[in-house]
Every structure is written in C-alpha cells, then in structure tokens.
Amino acid sequence: MSNIVWHQHAIDQAARGAQKGQNPVLLWFTGLSGSGKSTLAGALERALFEHGFHTYLLDGDNVRHGLCKDLGFSIEDRDENLRRVGEVAKLMVDSGLVVLSAFISPTREERDRVRALFPQGQFVEVHVSTPLSVCESRDPKGLYAKARKGEITNFTGISSPYEVPESAELTIDTSKGDLDTQVHGLLAYLKAIDVLNPPREIAGAGI
C-alpha cells in the first residue's frame, strides 16, 4: 500500500456539482424490509430527475445482482455489502450526483461507517420508521412469512435486531400520510440544505 498514492483530478467535486446546478449529497434510506425505503427513494428520484437534477438510486436488491453478487447474508457479508455500497456512493457523490440509497442497514455501526466517508452535511440519514406490524402485513416479498416459519435466519426485525437511528436527519413513517406529501417534504429539506441549487419549480411548489 505504501506505493499507492492518491491522484488528484483537475476537476473537483464542486465543479462537477456546479455544472449540474446542484450540490452533491447522499441520502441514506434505512429501515425494515417492507418499510417503504425503495418506494420513497424511487419517488424522490423521479421527482428530482423530472426537474433536471442528476441522480442515481442504489437499491439493496439490485447491487446483489452485480457488485455484491458474491456475498451472502452472514454478518460479515452484510458488513462487506454496505462497505462496498458506501465506497460506490462516495464515488458517485464525488461525480456531482445526488445519490439515494435504500438498504436495511440494521446497525448503527454500519451506518456510521458510511457516514464517516463524507464531510459534515453530505450524508443525510433518512430513517423510514414504519412499524414492524405494518411492514409484516405488507410483506411484498413473502420474507416475513418465511422468517416466521424459520425458513430464513438472521432476518431483521424477526430473528435479528434493527438498531433505530439515534440522530437521523429525517424520520418518515410511510404508513402515515401519502407518498406525494412525503416526497415534497424531502424536496423541501433538500432545498433548505442547499442541495437543489438553484431552486426550480417542482409540481408548482416552487422548490
């Protein structure tokens, strides 16, 4: 490693963001399976994309088809999964993008490890706090039913704990309110922290 040095690029993150008219950031959606992380992140990405912002959504299932296809679901593999995702997200933010990620990421240590990759204010933790009972009633993939039968081990919320964030920037319960209202709340937050620069008209809200 002593022979490996960091190569400084002529174009930096600020210049890439300025070209796109935005300040790059990572929004990290965390919560139980079925809480609505991917739905919420996808709806936010759609709203941003439709109004000219440059985004990318990293989804927990999708990365296991390529980047993390060699990993299982042991504690060690889940840690490595999020380590890789964090490094990829860092590269994407450096390219000037507004990056959204939707991962259960059940432990504070895992989430804090990713947060530590970014300067203050560039990692936004969004706790999708939908209650377990609601998530289990939705069970879009049938995973809770399998976990209850013992067919899946180490399943977050059933046989493995989920550590609630202690200092998330945002908390959203998708069982309360409608998706459009929740997305507009996220857009308003991004405007307030100067990610959306300059502000643009989004769905008549002046965001």
Curated annotation (Swiss-Prot):
<dbReference type="GO" id="GO:0004020">
    <property type="term" value="F:adenylylsulfate kinase activity"/>
</dbReference>
<dbReference type="InterPro" id="IPR027417">
    <property type="entry name" value="P-loop_NTPase"/>
</dbReference>
<keyword id="KW-0597">Phosphoprotein</keyword>
<keyword id="KW-0808">Transferase</keyword>
<dbReference type="GO" id="GO:0005524">
    <property type="term" value="F:ATP binding"/>
</dbReference>
<feature type="binding site">
    <location>
        <begin position="31"/>
        <end position="38"/>
    </location>
    <ligand>
        <name>ATP</name>
    </ligand>
</feature>
<protein>
    <recommendedName>
        <fullName>Adenylyl-sulfate kinase</fullName>
        <ecNumber>2.7.1.25</ecNumber>
    </recommendedName>
</protein>
<keyword id="KW-0067">ATP-binding</keyword>
<comment type="similarity">
    <text>Belongs to the APS kinase family.</text>
</comment>
<feature type="active site" description="Phosphoserine intermediate">
    <location>
        <position position="105"/>
    </location>
</feature>
<dbReference type="GO" id="GO:0070814">
    <property type="term" value="P:hydrogen sulfide biosynthetic process"/>
</dbReference>
<dbReference type="InterPro" id="IPR002891">
    <property type="entry name" value="APS_kinase"/>
</dbReference>
<dbReference type="GO" id="GO:0000103">
    <property type="term" value="P:sulfate assimilation"/>
</dbReference>
<comment type="function">
    <text>Catalyzes the synthesis of activated sulfate.</text>
</comment>
<comment type="pathway">
    <text>Sulfur metabolism; hydrogen sulfide biosynthesis; sulfite from sulfate: step 2/3.</text>
</comment>
<dbReference type="Pfam" id="PF01583">
    <property type="entry name" value="APS_kinase"/>
</dbReference>
<keyword id="KW-0418">Kinase</keyword>
<keyword id="KW-0547">Nucleotide-binding</keyword>
